[in-house]
């Protein structure tokens, strides 16, 4: 009987866990849908900024100041700034593994070349792993906010601009997961600084630029950095929720399979007990 009680207790426990994983799956699905809408709304904006930044500075009317040139030229013998986006929470499968592995490989490669490295880490999971080996490289760590990401984006943008203006870094790379679907996230390594200058005449023809004041270019640089960080952040968040939804769906299905096996085991145990009792009753009756 004690065995039956243990099986019933375990079935109850697994069912309780299954309810939690199912709820987490639904929450992640809801969050993923909302963020996908935000990404869709921002796609035109990021595309327009990219095109403008890659063309406007090749036009003769736009002359870069010394301060502005720092965003377009590689500063020799300066640090490589690596911005690593991971998750704040777990239960999202292998979501963080690929990014952390890539960052470790790149750090090793840069260190072997004798180059300087600065790390900015977003997300508790990435920070907990990377601080064990690379604490001396970590410049900043930011927690992922549950909502309202604008403040984090502004903080990151200001840190990047300060580092460039003070000649602390030679380039800046963002590591994040790009969303393909709920089951697939693409590891993305995007170089955002120095800003590449090239001219696409087919694009320039669609724009009419008017130079208004000396702050035009610096304002565009601000918009460019904000857009790049915002894009990476949203992609990483929706990828995390997709990975978590998939992981929780798998956990829910596994729990269902385990419940079926435990119920079968429970029924067999009960059947064995009943059969044993019947045999004892029959044996007793025959003895009489």
Swiss-Prot record:
SUPFAM superfamilies for this protein: ATP synthase (F1-ATPase), gamma subunit
Membrane topology: Peripheral membrane protein
Principal place of residence: membrane
InterPro entries registered for this protein in UniProt: ATP_synth_F1_ATPase_gsu, ATP_synth_F1_gsu, ATP_synth_F1_gsu_CS
Keyword terms: ATP synthesis, Cell inner membrane, Cell membrane, CF(1), Hydrogen ion transport, Ion transport, Membrane, Transport
GO molecular function annotations of the record: ATP binding; proton-transporting ATP synthase activity, rotational mechanism
Gene Ontology BP, a term: proton motive force-driven plasma membrane ATP synthesis
Subcellular location: Cell inner membrane
Coiled-coil portions: none
Any GO CC annotation of this UniProt entry: proton-transporting ATP synthase complex
Tree of life domain: Bacteria
Ranges that cross the membrane: none
Binding partners and assembly: F-type ATPases have 2 components, CF(1) - the catalytic core - and CF(0) - the membrane proton channel. CF(1) has five subunits: alpha(3), beta(3), gamma(1), delta(1), epsilon(1). CF(0) has three main subunits: a, b and c.
Task performed by this protein: Produces ATP from ADP in the presence of a proton gradient across the membrane. The gamma chain is believed to be important in regulating ATPase activity and the flow of protons through the CF(0) complex.
Family stated for the protein in its record: Belongs to the ATPase gamma chain family.
PANTHER family the UniProt entry points to: ATP SYNTHASE GAMMA CHAIN, ATP SYNTHASE SUBUNIT GAMMA, MITOCHONDRIAL
HAMAP family to which the protein is assigned, alphabetical: ATP_synth_gamma_bact
Name by which UniProt lists this protein: ATP synthase gamma chain
